[in-house]
Amino acid sequence: MAEEDYLPVYQLRRDSSLLGTMNKILVANRGEIPIRIFRTAHELSMNTVAIYSHEDRLSMHRLKADEAYVIGERGQYSPVQAYLAIDEIIKIAVKHNVNMIHPGYGFCSENSEFARKVEENGILWVGPSDTVIDAVGDKVSARNLAYAANVPTVPGTPGPIEDVAQATAFVEEYGYPVIIKAAFGGGGRGMRVVREGDDIEDAFLRASSEAKTAFGNGTVFIERFLDKPKHIEVQLLADNYGNVIHLFERDCSVQRRHQKVARNCSAKTLPVEVRNAILNDAVKLAKTANYRNAGTAEFLVDSQNRHYFIEINPRIQVEHTITEEITGVDIVAAQIQIAAGASLEQLGLLQEKITTRGFAIQCRITTEDPTKNFQPDTGKIEVYRSSGGNGVRLDGGNGFAGAVISPHYDSMLVKCSTSGSNYEIRRRKMIRALVEFRIRGVKTNIPFLLALLTHPVFMTSECWTTFIDDTPELFKILTSQNRAQKLLAYLGDLAVNGSSIKGQIGLPKLHKEADIPSITDINGDVIDVSIPPPDGWRQFLLEKGPEQFAQQVRAFPGLMIMDTTWRDAHQSLLATRVRTHDLLNIAPATSYALHHAFALECWGGATFDVSMRFLHEDPWQRLRKLRKAVPNIPFSMLLRGGNGVAYYSLPDNAIDHFLKQAKDTGVDVFRVFDALNDIEQLKVGVDAVKKAGGVVEATMCYSGDMLKPGKKYNLEYYINLATEIVEMGTHILAVKDMAGTLKPTAAKQLISALRRKFPSLPIHVHTHDSAGTGVASMVACARAGADVVTVRVNSMSGMTSQPSMSAFIASLDGEIETGIPEANAREIDAYWAEMRLLYSCFEADLKGPDPEVYQHEIPGGQLTNLLFQAQQVGLGEKWVETKKAYEAANRLLGDIVKVTPTSKVVGDLAQFMVSNKLSSEDVERLASELDFPDSVLDFFEGLMGTPYGGFPEPLRTNVISGKRRKLTSRPGLTLEPYNIPAIREDLEARFSKVTENDVASYNMYPKVYEAYKKQQELYGDLSVLPTRNFLSPPKIDEERHVTIVTIETRKTLIIKCMAEGELSQSSGTREVYFELNGEMRKVTVEDKNGAVETITRPKADAHNPNEIGAPMAGVVVEVRVHENGEVKKGDPIAVLSAMKMEMVISSPVAGRIGQIAVKENDSVDASDLIPKSSRLSKLLMFIILIILY
């Protein structure tokens, strides 16, 4: 040969001398492989032509070519058929003077007719000849080729099988298991493994049908199935002159349903002699077939290292990239130049010169959801950030932000290949590369790939072809958190629709981050609160246990305080809306300022469900974070006895389970009460706390004014109740004055009597300052012998809240020591003063003390919520009337102890009376006919326990007659224990990352928990958002409105809202654009006000008993009847939701439903027509199912 024939490859490419006039190439494919081929073609100075279907008009491969042409007319071909339309493709090639056609892989790459027609039209086919494709592309023909080359094959049918009878005959001779395979094509399509006779017919039909759909040919054959073999394939290159070389082998054993998932190069565990035998057989097969161009010979290796030839793929393979990485050979360049007539020698591709260097691995990143059996996901890619760096190669297709992933084509986004000097290095590179990817908007298989790459079997390269199917633990996947994009989705919704937080009126008045105050020591020097705080009472408790802790509290020479700012304060003043973010900000300072405090009340009660229901936070995560931030002060929680933190009785084992989780997560002191002071209900909670190992603070609820003559809750009652509690066993005795009706004189008498009766028992008193006498009452308690009182920081005190900490400390100055420097109390109060501005949109707007509390006795925590609720359901103008009705309702119920949930019974009955204009006499007279609120029925049934003095009769009997039973024992005894393992299993099937905390949450509030998890799926962890950004819509393109979010330590997001798009008339959505850490991102948001249809609803005629109207404004949750349906007395008709209440509208008499004027999710106003009945004759009342928060 001439000297120029031995020029290096890069010089040949540069002058393209081997290509001659072959300067224009068309790739008859789509997605990633055309782009790969175009890149090499450009390096060879060639012009490139892409083809595309109408559905692919936005695909990246169209843009990467010099020219691009659509296949046929719109609608002429289906999305897949377009790439199988060989005549149309050739017509495009001829029309535009194409010299070469490269088929890529898939579609027509193994279609001999296509190859033949291409060459008949004078165009070079980049691949083996049509006769070779016929000889090796058909797996049956390939088997015959193997016989001719004396290469071992798996026993199978000598030719294609036509029907089930032939398949059955084969298995009768060779036995099971067998595999039915498509004769044409690959990729796992048209394959079925059959292990027993009953499945053979279905497997044959499905394999044939699938092959027909995928490859246009339903021919199949059958062979013995090797159990747990390795899949080894050899990369071949052959020129037009009979020369064949191999580029070594690839281990493609990691498959799912016969489709390769991860490809390794080379095969690490293959013995040398087996490798050489396979390589030699591959070359022998190619020479026997007179093969040309690139191809792959595939083999199976059984457990005895015997290899069997299975097929030759007469095309380039998906995984060719890793062979290129370890050999340095550009296989596509070799294909093109061989097609143009170059020899392997001219290309410098001589077998003895080809070596491998290191190892490589390839993973296909697809839009498949591994948690749903790899179901392909579709949609628009919102974010696409790829990997890179040393040893990483990416071959991409439609992986870019804005790409629409359709269901028509393969779900691959990009092929990621990594290489390294050894097997472990390239594995670690792949893990790193996959972790760097950020793909949002569609599900991907990246989490599964990471699980695979870290599995011990994969790490040793001992996998077999069914490894994935045989290894279920691979599917215990840690899915991507997608935190940033989910936060943008929330902020986008906030920008378009405004805040959706219930109860918010207006926007926060604080327009900056709150200042964190400095804490000073006794010398006035600033303390560094970033270092661990000094030991507090919690260290003593952890070391000595509850018993000695209680003794030490009693022995304390002064008075201890519990601060309720973190729970009861914001429940009483701010609708329980203070977020974890703001508690954590002040936590380090608090751990210093109040390190001598008895406890911080920060959990339980209404904060538990409100965290999930309205703040979209996990209450357990709040507890964990606060516990970490404040390790030195005991945490206290409020526990509703046999209800846990729910508003209804639960099985005892659910209470036990919940309290174990609470104790393990960080609660120390459990303030246990029962809403009726029912000792049996109280005992459930007390016993559960003892089992959990917590400090028991058994609590008796103070109600009314014990100084008032004739009051049934007098001093004797409380002393007797306390005696029962002490006999039951408690570490601390607590008094809970929830309405603030414990006057100073009564406080002195009660605490003095308790101290005389129980001289060694610590006493803790809790009150509300509704009447303005809270500080005086707590001072009286201190002087009478109380050990602990409840106060809160000044800015969060007063009115329905607890007394002021500073005022209380000052009142005892020089008399009783609290251990809390008043200066420190003032320092942390500065922060909470700003919090009142930040949460001003939840203020109840109370102007001052309300001495009327001594008459209506509404608990402090309920007063603001009841006012807010009344406003939401249209009774705001009747607030004075509602308070009077509260007094009347309490008398009707027998003057009960009023604390959640019994206080809600009184409140619901009061609103029911006001809404329906009922007096006390009306209620008593019509009790058997009225549909009372469900909470009232629960009370009279006995589900809340038994009130002191019993139930009022005959009212109880009349109310529940025909509707409820009368319980005579503790409610929990009537409930079946929860199957907690089964509940966890159910939650794990529905939600990700389920813990015992989640199970406990679900047990307390099933619907609330489910709604919270769904919200979390949409928006992620919203607790990381600063509160002003959580409540206020972002402003467009203003530097001062940048949102800075710390999602974890040392990981910060800087978010800026850039623009809001126009309303889409077709979808009712808007696109909102953000700058996230300097990178543009977009979210699509439904505009809930953009296409609102104005609906004027008919009103029910109050004088027509056949027309049933809504009692107050709300949303239709459910319609339970249909038109012309018959109803019996008491049958539910519809369910309405109005803030805290759900109203089940039921029929008081039998009748037939006529027109139904509403549907689910409709908003209705008071008196809006719900159904019209043809035969209802009595006034319809309403059952109110209380959903509390």
Swiss-Prot record:
Modification sites for N6-biotinyllysine: K1140
Protein name: Pyruvate carboxylase
Domain Biotin carboxylation per the UniProt entry, residue ranges: 21-473
Transmembrane feature ranges: none
InterPro entries from the UniProt entry: Aldolase_TIM (IPR013785), ATP-grasp (IPR011761), BC-like_N (IPR005481), Biotin_BS (IPR001882), Biotin_carboxylation_dom (IPR011764), Biotin_COase_C (IPR005482), Biotin_lipoyl (IPR000089), Carboxylase_cons_dom (IPR003379)
Annotated SUPFAM superfamilies: Aldolase, Glutathione synthetase ATP-binding domain-like, post-HMGL domain-like, PreATP-grasp domain, Rudiment single hybrid motif, Single hybrid motif
EC numbers: 6.4.1.1
Active site: R315
Residues annotated for substrate binding in this entry: R567, D568, A569, H570, Q571, R640, T900
Domain Pyruvate carboxyltransferase: 559-826
Cofactor(s), names only, from the UniProt record: biotin; Zn(2+)
Species the sequence originates in: Komagataella pastoris (Yeast)
Subcellular location(s) per record: Cytoplasm
Entry-annotated residues carrying N6-carboxylysine: K736
GO cellular component, one term: cytoplasm
Catalytic activity: hydrogencarbonate + pyruvate + ATP = oxaloacetate + ADP + phosphate + H(+)
Major place of residence: cytoplasm
UniProt binding sites for a divalent metal cation: D568, K736, H766, H768
One Pfam family cited in the UniProt record for this chain: HMGL-like
Residue positions binding ATP: K139, E223, H258
Residue ranges of every copy of the ATP-grasp domain listed in the record: 143-340
Example GO BP: gluconeogenesis
Function comment: Pyruvate carboxylase catalyzes a 2-step reaction, involving the ATP-dependent carboxylation of the covalently attached biotin in the first step and the transfer of the carboxyl group to pyruvate in the second.
Biotinyl-binding domain residues: 1099-1174
Pathway(s) per entry: Carbohydrate biosynthesis; gluconeogenesis
Lineage, uppermost ranks: Eukaryota, Fungi, Dikarya, Ascomycota, Saccharomycotina
Molecular function terms from GO: ATP binding; metal ion binding; pyruvate carboxylase activity
